[in-house]
Amino acid sequence: MNKLTCVVSCPIDVISGYGARSRDFVKALIKVKGEEWDIKILSQRWGECPYGALDNNVPEDLDLLRRVIGPMERQPDIWFQITVANEFQPVGKVSIGVSALVETNILPAELLEGLNRMTFNIVSSNFVKDTAANTSFDKLDQNTKQKQGTVELTKPIEVLFEGVDTNKYKRLENSDFDLSEIKEEFCFITVGHWLAGDVGEDRKQLTTLIKAFLSAFKDKKKRPALILKTSLAGFSIIEEETILDKIDVIRKSVGGDMPNIYLLYGELTEEEMNHLYNHDKVKAFALVGNEGFGRPYLEFSAASSKPIIASPFSGHVDFLNQEFNIFVAGRVEQLHPSAVNQFLIKESSWFKADPKSIEDSLKAVYENYPKYIDNAKRQGHQSRTQFSYDKMVERLAEILNKNVPKISAPQTITLPKLKTL
């Protein structure tokens, strides 16, 4: 049986959020369409993020590496492009864009135009889908500046959540992650990149969380610690020192006798992260910013069934149940100039957590921890059963069956040999 040709352009071997999404997506695609499509991978860079996510010694990873091809010689039947949407190009007979888009309430026009170039698109959360669907811009003539029309979403868009691998993120009786240097028995943990923006203005609100944690527990005899798993762009001694300096600036702004913050720096395997989340000293997860999806929330919940403090805005609310988690107060505000970039445009808004609400939430979980355990277990069960990788595979099958038009695979015809006259 001849198969349709399928090429997936993505950062398959890159250590980054888009890299992780690419690997999960392609593995799911192989499960769903591997018998019908000849699936190949066009490996791409992702900014300055390092390579090396794939391991030759892992059979699934080796299969992905063997599917990597050089420059294409002909048009594929099916084309997937996992990247920022302004880079989308309709290369295949059917072209499908996969993107996280943005974490704000307005999509830049160039991303909308990219979505409209594809046959259909796949995003990670309902928040992102709604942002795309609700954004429109006036299209102006470059010379007269007169309105010529409207730029808005014209192509279908589907939601495929980033399912957690429950074979990797799961409950453990004992954790062998070494936290012996941490003296505190109660630690909050936060996981996320330290992104651009002044203190209190970064997308993930790490600086707001750090400052609120220090303020909540300063000058107290009994207090928890905060484990901060973060990085800027890569992993280096210089970058680590830069992060420590940033933390020190916040500490000096608070003053007093402050609780400890432990920087956990460097790349960890998923097995190591699972052991970290299951450690007895790690009691709760806190992250109060804006997410396209929010993989760390889901992975922590599935692994540990421990309490989560979060913002009530953006991608992670798809899977964080309002009844089972602690949501901080705040308001949706226009972006600060220090956080603006090509895709996070100045006209857009996102969630700004209220520092006092963060402090109150941290104190409540620390001082009344047993109160939050049952709901955390319910959230963990929901994460493992409703938002697993296997459920993601099922959802991908539904999306493809619904949206990919029928294409006939090329047939090989064997002609009979003719007699020579």
Where on the chain are the PLM-derived regions?
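Acidic donor-binding loop of glycosyltransferase active sites
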Residues: 275-292, 303-306
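Conserved catalytic-core segment of nucleotide-activated headgroup transferases in glycan assembly
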Residues: 21-23, 28, 166-275
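Extended catalytic core of nucleotide-activated donor transferases of GT-like folds
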Residues: 7-9, 48-133
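Donor nucleotide-sugar binding/catalytic pocket of nucleotide-sugar-dependent glycosyltransferases
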Residues: 120-171
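N-terminal pre-catalytic "stem/leader" segment of glycosyltransferase-like enzymes
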Residues: 1-76, 225, 394-399, 419-421
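A charged, aromatic-enriched C-terminal amphipathic alpha-helix characteristic of glycosyltransferases
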Residues: 349-357, 367-398
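C-terminal alpha-helical cap of glycosyltransferases
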Residues: 368, 389-421
